[in-house]
From Swiss-Prot:
<keyword id="KW-0206">Cytoskeleton</keyword>
<dbReference type="Pfam" id="PF12836">
    <property type="entry name" value="HHH_3"/>
</dbReference>
<keyword id="KW-0175">Coiled coil</keyword>
<feature type="short sequence motif" description="Important for regulated proteolytic degradation">
    <location>
        <begin position="549"/>
        <end position="552"/>
    </location>
</feature>
<dbReference type="GO" id="GO:0005737">
    <property type="term" value="C:cytoplasm"/>
</dbReference>
<dbReference type="GO" id="GO:0005874">
    <property type="term" value="C:microtubule"/>
</dbReference>
<dbReference type="InterPro" id="IPR019821">
    <property type="entry name" value="Kinesin_motor_CS"/>
</dbReference>
<comment type="function">
    <text>Kinesin family member that is involved in spindle formation and the movements of chromosomes during mitosis and meiosis. Binds to microtubules and to DNA.</text>
</comment>
<feature type="domain" description="Kinesin motor">
    <location>
        <begin position="18"/>
        <end position="345"/>
    </location>
</feature>
<keyword id="KW-0238">DNA-binding</keyword>
<comment type="similarity">
    <text>Belongs to the TRAFAC class myosin-kinesin ATPase superfamily. Kinesin family.</text>
</comment>
<dbReference type="GO" id="GO:0008017">
    <property type="term" value="F:microtubule binding"/>
</dbReference>
<feature type="coiled-coil region">
    <location>
        <begin position="439"/>
        <end position="484"/>
    </location>
</feature>
<dbReference type="InterPro" id="IPR010994">
    <property type="entry name" value="RuvA_2-like"/>
</dbReference>
<dbReference type="InterPro" id="IPR001752">
    <property type="entry name" value="Kinesin_motor_dom"/>
</dbReference>
<dbReference type="InterPro" id="IPR027417">
    <property type="entry name" value="P-loop_NTPase"/>
</dbReference>
<dbReference type="InterPro" id="IPR027640">
    <property type="entry name" value="Kinesin-like_fam"/>
</dbReference>
Length: 639
């Protein structure tokens, strides 16, 4: 059962937490600006900046935020000043989010990822989070608590949520549970115990993100990337509380002006999807600031995923990245206006706590449920059951009766009973889990268990009957087989084989399979040769008849006489050396082309010494020569 707990007190309303907005100015690149050497943005102090008013060049517009970082600010300053303070909220079951916003080429990915010498927000946050959980787990107040950290990494590409840890080319759905938590069913989750584990999963996954080159950015992100770090704090003793905090680290794709980027084809389609989702994001911010009854979170996958971060239950930090060049003036102005509106959004963080309760107190039971329970117990008493099967019901009824008097007991006695229940739970006794089950569910489970036991007994009896029938059928088969095998070879005209019936459902024997010894059939020429008294085949050996159930085994072996084979080979060789094209074509596997090849080879190299010399011809292999001999030997002998 999930409980939503406030930051300060469970019985008070949740405290409000405004979205904190920080602005980072990218260093000025003189080589990119062809119009003017001066920057269009200038920082005033650590929280405010000014930009030239495009309507009146003599005026400037000032903006104030939670933090402003100039072009000389380091990655560490940004992380320590705006991000690290939200991480402790994860250890008490609250959500947090950090997302980078700004036009293309303003440095969002550098702020979130960085490089090996200057790591960004993501690696620093993961490293500190791992260190915080190790420190908290070693404290005496968390002796019975364990911490588990998992990560998921997805991208929103053309309004499709794609898994980056295990790419499947499948659009993942975004769902909302009964406690209004946003989740992605089916997304890959990897457990991380050290920063090395994180690097092992994150670096290959980052290479799966879609990037491309445009006129404004050599490595432009074509999708929104979302890294989800989940921290789960679990209590190992009763009441087994569980606190779950989620950290969203989001690198948004930048808005693009296709007239300047020169996007075409697939890049134009990607740019349209990016601009559409960012426009929906601005509509969500406007609706939250105006207090509208409907917030268009569902109009885009991006805003649906950011629902917790904007007007939801997370501690949110937005880092707006801007560029100082004159050609980015309107992009910078749009980003500053969006950041100014975002800092007015109010979130209401809660601790997401799940408690595995012990047994529900009987005082909380409704009168109707008590009446149904009593009626069910009276009906069970009237039913006829075995004494052994009724003993669990009796013990559980007694336990229920003891629970009914719990509210009337002395508080000290109640406390001792709860301690005893805790001891039983820690020892892993099955009865503790059984007592925590509602009575109606308990009786339904027992009824199903009894029915399954009866079904098992019926199946056992049926199995015994089938085994007995199989044994009887096997005995009859063995007796019949022995009588058949005792017959003499001269009187045997057929041998009957029966398959054993072990495992069959019926005792009826299978139909007999008969193997008959049939006379060998040959062609007319071969038959006439045999009738003339020239024995072509000689009898080698008769195999014994086997009655072990193997069928289709020949009982005779025959060999062709070797002198006839040699005679046939000589006649084939003679035909190869003296035959014309027509005579050669009368041989099997010899056509017009091969006949001409044989005559040509014979004219150049002289007569063949043996039939195997055919392999010397172009296009005739040794395997084909063997096939040629087999195909012609019998017909040559019979002719």
């Amino acid at each position: 059962m999930a409980k939503r707990v406030s930051i300060l007190d469970q019985h008070k309303k949740p405290s409000s937490a405004r979205v904190r907005v920080a602005v980072r100015l990218r260093p000025y690149m003189e080589k990119e600006d062809e119009k003017a050497p001066a920057a269009c943005v200038r920082g005033l102090d650590s929280q405010s900046l000014e930009i030239v008013n495009w309507r009146n060049q003599l005026e400037t517009m000032q903006y104030q935020f939670d933090a402003f970082y100039g072009d000389s600010a380091t990655q560490r300053e940004i992380y320590m000043g705006s991000v690290c303070h939200i991480l402790p909220h994860l250890l008490i079951g609250q959500n947090a989010s950090v997302f980078a916003y700004g036009p293309t080429g303003a440095g969002k990915t550098h702020t979130m990822l960085g490089n090996p010498s200057q790591p960004g927000v993501i690696p620093r946050a993961v490293r500190d989070l791992l260190q915080m959980t190790r420190t908290a787990a070693g404290g005496p107040e968390n002796e019975n608590w364990t911490y588990t950290i998992t990560m998921s990494y997805v991208e929103i590409y053309q309004e499709k949520v794609m898994d980056l840890l295990e790419p499947k080319n499948k659009d993942l759905p975004i769902r909302e549970d009964k406690d209004h938590n946003i989740l992605i069913p089916g997304v890959t989750q990897k457990t991380i115990n050290s920063f090395g584990d994180f690097d092992e999963h994150f670096i290959p996954a980052s290479q799966n993100r879609t990037v491309a080159s445009t006129k404004l950015n050599d490595r432009s992100s074509r999708s929104h990337a979302v890294l989800l770090i989940k921290v789960q704090k679990s209590q190992q003793v009763s009441p087994f509380r569980q606190l779950t905090g989620k950290l969203y680290l989001i690198d948004l794709a930048g808005s693009e002006d296709n007239r300047r980027t020169g996007n075409q084809g697939i890049r134009l389609k990607e740019s349209g999807a990016i601009n559409s989702s960012l426009f929906t994001l601005s509509k969500v911010v406007d609706a939250l600031n105006q207090g509208l009854p409907r917030i268009p979170y569902r109009d885009s996958k991006l805003t649906r995923l950011l629902q917790d971060s904007l007007g939801g239950t997370a501690h949110s930090v937005m880092i707006a990245n801007i560029a100082p060049e004159q050609k980015y003036y309107f992009d910078t102005l749009t980003a500053l206006n969006f950041a100014a509106k975002s800092k007015q959004i109010i979130n209401k963080p809660f601790s997401q706590e799940t408690t595995q309760s012990i047994a529900a107190l009987p005082a909380m039971k409704r009168p109707r449920e008590e009446a149904e329970t009593a009626a069910g117990s009276r009906q069970r008493k009237k039913s006829k059951t075995d004494s052994t099967e009724s003993s669990p019901n009796t013990s559980m009824d007694a336990a229920s009766k003891r629970k009914l008097n719990l509210a009337a007991l002395d508080p000290a006695v109640v406390e001792r009973l709860l301690k005893l229940d805790k001891i039983l739970t820690e020892k892993g006794m099955k009865e503790a889990q059984l007592l925590s089950t509602p009575k109606r569910e308990r009786m339904a489970l027992l009824k199903k268990w009894e029915e399954s036991q009866m079904e098992i007994e019926r199946l056992k009896e049926k199995q015994k009957e089938l085994e007995q029938k199989a044994i009887e059928a096997e005995a009859r088969l063995e007796k019949s087989t022995n009588s058949d095998c005792n017959l003499s070879d001269s009187s045997v005209s057929e041998c009957t084989f029966r398959a054993p019936l072990r495992g069959r459902n019926t005792s009826t024997a299978k139909a007999k399979k008969v193997l008959r010894v049939l006379p060998m059939q040959g062609n007319s020429q071969l038959q006439s040769t045999i009738e003339e008294g020239i024995p072509v085949f000689e009898k080698k050996k008769k195999k014994p008849v086997s009655c072990d159930g193997r069928e289709n085994q020949p009982t005779w072996e025959v060999n062709v006489r070797t002198d006839l084979l040699e005679s046939g080979r000589e006649r084939i060789l003679k035909l190869l050396n003296t035959g014309s094209v027509k005579e050669l074509k009368s041989l099997q596997k010899i056509g017009d082309k091969k006949a001409k090849l044989i005559i040509g080879w014979r004219e150049v190299n002289g007569p063949f010494k043996n039939v195997e010399d055919l392999a010397s011809l172009e296009g005739i292999s040794a395997k084909q020569v063997t096939s040629f001999i087999k195909a012609n030997i019998l017909s040559i002998i019979a002719s």
